[in-house]
Amino acid sequence: MAVIKCKPTSPGRRHLVKVVNSDLHKGKPFAGLLAKKSKSGGRNNTGRITVRHIGGGHKQHYRLIDFKRNKDGIPAKVERLEYDPNRTANIALVLYADGERRYILAAKGMKAGDKIQSGIDAEIKSGNALPLRNIPVGSVVHAVEMKPAKGAQIARSAGAYVQVIARDGAYATLRLRSGEMRKVPVDCRATLGEVGNAEHMLRQLGKAGAKRWRGVRPTVRGVAMNPVDHPHGGGEGRTSGGRHPVSPWGQPTKGYKTRSNKRTDKYIVRRRNKK
């Protein structure tokens, strides 16, 4: 995959940086693994905006991804790689020996024709899914479960991975990209290797309209509002806000910790690194 900086033939292309995925399927997705995806416009069931800056965008289908990788002992072949508008990673359509097709996250280096497998007997190679108890310490993995058979929750975005750094009894210790070290049951599954499409972080959309295509609406600064609308609003002329940055509801932002889940604190060995 290559990164291309476009020539400035128009203002919208002047800052455009694209990731060229020439190996992706150019046709339609596999219809049997699509689901309806309705847009909410950021509104809840009462019609009130609960998430700002959401609305519009291109119509999309949801791709049903196999995050459990529980089809053990049956080899599969990667038919093709596809773009998925619902995530930063690319996805792979795999065909199992019994004829079933599933979508999985495309691992780094995965290509059409590759053979993959799940289960405790699977080979230690990128794209194969095994329980953490069967993965060698020091291995790099992605799509990691937090509870056995629940489905992958950790390291699912483009270029993401975690490292298995220890295994003690019923738990394996993982080092996340943030620096956090966390315990996970050894019966949880993980896929070997990194998530592909790591170049996603290098892209630049180039113009505001590209954000609108993705369903993202403009963000108005608090200092540009009236006092009734935001704690930073009002004042004569331009102001800096006059206080530490807060949300429209007065919650400190830019680094303020809001995590409150004492039930799972015991699984965190070390907190993430400070930026």
Curated annotation (Swiss-Prot):
Gene Ontology molecular function terms on file: rRNA binding; structural constituent of ribosome; transferase activity
One BP annotation, GO: cytoplasmic translation
Keyword Ribosomal protein: yes
Record flagged with keyword Ribosomal protein: yes
Superkingdom of the organism of origin: Bacteria
Region described as Disordered: 223-275
InterPro entries: NA-bd_OB-fold, Rib_uL2_dom2, Ribosomal_uL2, Ribosomal_uL2_bac/org-type, Ribosomal_uL2_C, Ribosomal_uL2_CS, Ribosomal_uL2_dom3, Ribosomal_uL2_RNA-bd_dom
CC per GO annotation: large ribosomal subunit
Segments crossing the lipid bilayer: none
Record keywords: Ribonucleoprotein, Ribosomal protein, RNA-binding, rRNA-binding
Function: One of the primary rRNA binding proteins. Required for association of the 30S and 50S subunits to form the 70S ribosome, for tRNA binding and peptide bond formation. It has been suggested to have peptidyltransferase activity; this is somewhat controversial. Makes several contacts with the 16S rRNA in the 70S ribosome.
Family: Belongs to the universal ribosomal protein uL2 family.
Description of how the protein assembles with itself and partners: Part of the 50S ribosomal subunit. Forms a bridge to the 30S subunit in the 70S ribosome.
Name of protein: Large ribosomal subunit protein uL2
Organism: Shewanella pealeana (strain ATCC 700345 / ANG-SQ1)
Gene label: rplB
